[in-house]
Amino acid sequence: MLLFFCYLIDLTDAKLGKNSINTSFVSGYGTTYPRQIHHRIAEVNQVILKGALVGGPDGNIESDLPPAKKYWDDSSMYSTNEVAIYYNSPLVFVLSAFQ
């Protein structure tokens, strides 16, 4: 159980900015975070949807960069910057365990 808990901490740290590009994938969290998320309401109103988790790096994007660095803060890049319930609900579940 302790090993699993440590694994969850590492995964959460990676989403919050302890990763190869030093970027938080939760908008509004940290100093470097997604500002151009793929979310229709946020795009139209030009607001930062604080607390939303985006997908992060996409190893399938054609680039010379290593897979963990294939991330662009661009609202047209839905594979890296989309806000989806299947990203955000597990994050809420894991963070609730850290109380």
In which residue ranges do the predicted regions lie?
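Aromatic (Trp/Tyr) and acidic
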Residues: 1-99
